[in-house]
């Protein structure tokens, strides 16, 4: 698409000058947009670097203006002015616990923002497996549905276990929400109990439901008939496993007929940590998983071929309305939702969301989102982890557009201060 797209397509103010798959993209000004030539930046180069330490070094050395800086590395650029003397004193950069009162080290600008960006993990109700001989880095690879559950008891495998609400509910109780909010994200994730983030209309229609409770998770699996019966050494992604004879069972058998695949991409240490935790937790209650971090090519193949079961991701709003979360998160494709390709269709949720998005009566909308939440917690299609409230950092010569809670900043709204006689002219 980048090679064959129409002139100026996709970027408007900037054109794709060159690109290398999974490596970099270079943008230059589009003369049809900047007729008077008054563009701010004459070239944008964006490079994919999966290793956090490499990104940190490039940013510290000034090779790049922006970078995906890990939370634990922010102490290199920011500190908390604990004694309010306007200076960096010994120990003030040991931790950034008081994030709203962040201060900046020389050469950087650190800013705390409370956002509507949501961190989540989506469930795939109709997972597939790559067909024999297909390449894991080919996004056009052929894949087939994994049918491993008999929903009617007639002996025919007619669906996937991920279609059962009980399994998804149990998985939701195997995630350690508070540890990830406090430790993995260093208190940069605020609790979020449903699709609507705090600060939006009708956020109060949601209450804390899912917590880290492996005892409950295991009880849900047992009640749903997912008992320990499969020889774990025979499990694969799609083939039938060996059922252990009742007399030979030791209690260490697996509960599901196939391995659940958990998607996390290389370079995102937070997703990797969350994937590792839930994989370990599920393993303790008899659910086998595969959760190693994937290189970007393999990650994209899993996404496009639907060869995944649980996928860690995120969401930033396009507009400030609760339906901008509810519909893409948990609305069915039939009502224009399901942005994450979960295959989720819950009639009660859909009906409530249609009312919520179309009614102009406040009480009616509130009740609609209450109804949607009540139906969703019995049949969840994702784990909603939290909303990001944290610190961002940039070099002090980078001029940014005013912060907006929706969407993302446009490339053409950035500027850089000129350096004259060794000093920056102006301020950001």
Can you name each region flagged by the protein language model?
Residues 1-43, 51-54, 214-223, 420-421, ...:
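Gly/Pro-rich hinge or "lid" segments in bacterial periplasmic/extracellular proteins
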Residues 12-15, 25-26, 42-47, 256-266, ...:
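Short, well-ordered beta-strand elements
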Residues 59-60, 64-69, 81-90, 94-110, ...:
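Periplasmic binding protein-like
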Residues 125-182, 349-366:
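Extended ligand-binding regions for polar small-molecule ligands
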Residues 1-9, 78-108, 128-163, 230-259, ...:
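Surface-exposed intrinsically disordered loops and tails
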Residues 10-12, 23, 40-42, 117-119, ...:
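Envelope-exposed proteins and targeting segments
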Residues 20-24, 29, 112, 116-119, ...:
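Detector for C-terminal structural segments
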């Amino acid at each position: 698409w980048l090679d064959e797209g129409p002139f100026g397509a996709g970027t408007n103010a900037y054109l794709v000058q060159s690109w290398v798959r999974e490596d970099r993209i270079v943008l230059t000004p589009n003369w049809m947009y900047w007729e008077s030539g008054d563009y701010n930046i004459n070239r944008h180069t964006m490079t994919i670097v999966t290793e956090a330490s490499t990104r940190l070094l490039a940013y510290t050395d000034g090779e790049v203006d922006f970078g995906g800086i890990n939370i634990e590395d922010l102490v290199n650029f920011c500190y908390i002015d604990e004694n309010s003397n306007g200076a960096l004193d010994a120990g003030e950069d040991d931790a950034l616990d008081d994030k709203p009162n962040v201060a900046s080290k020389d050469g950087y600008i650190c800013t705390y923002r409370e956002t509507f960006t949501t961190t989540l993990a989506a469930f795939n109700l109709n997972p597939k497996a790559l067909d024999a001989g297909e390449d894991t880095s080919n996004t056009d690879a052929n894949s087939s549905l994994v049918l491993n559950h008999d929903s009617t008891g007639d002996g025919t495998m007619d669906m996937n276990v991920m279609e059962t609400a009980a399994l998804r509910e149990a998985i939701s109780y195997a995630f350690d929400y508070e540890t990830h909010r406090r430790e993995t994200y260093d208190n940069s994730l605020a609790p979020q109990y449903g699709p609507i983030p705090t600060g939006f209309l009708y956020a109060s229609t949601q209450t804390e439901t899912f917590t880290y409770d492996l005892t409950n998770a295991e009880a849900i699996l047992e009640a749903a008939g997912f008992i320990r019966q499969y020889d774990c050494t025979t499990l694969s992604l799609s083939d039938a496993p060996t059922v252990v004879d009742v007399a030979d069972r030791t209690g260490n058998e697996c509960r599901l007929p196939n391995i659940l695949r958990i998607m996390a991409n290389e370079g995102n240490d937070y997703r990797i940590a969350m994937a590792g935790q839930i994989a370990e937790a599920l393993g303790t209650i008899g659910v086998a998983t595969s959760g190693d971090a994937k290189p970007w090519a393999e990650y994209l193949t899993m996404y496009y071929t639907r060869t995944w079961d649980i996928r860690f991701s995120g969401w930033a709003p396009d507009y400030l309305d609760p339906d901008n979360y509810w519909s893409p998160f948990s609305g069915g494709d039939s009502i224009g939702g399901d942005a994450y390709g979960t295959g989720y269709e819950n009639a009660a949720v859909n009906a409530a969301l249609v009312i919520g998005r179309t009614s102009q009566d406040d009480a009616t909308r509130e009740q609609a989102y209450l109804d949607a939440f009540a139906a969703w917690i019995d049949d969840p299609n994702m784990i909603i982890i939290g909303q990001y409230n944290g610190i961002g950092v940039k070099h002090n010569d980078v001029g940014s557009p005013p912060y907006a809670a929706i969407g993302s900043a446009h490339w053409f709204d950035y500027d850089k201060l000129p350096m004259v006689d060794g000093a920056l002219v102006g301020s950001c």
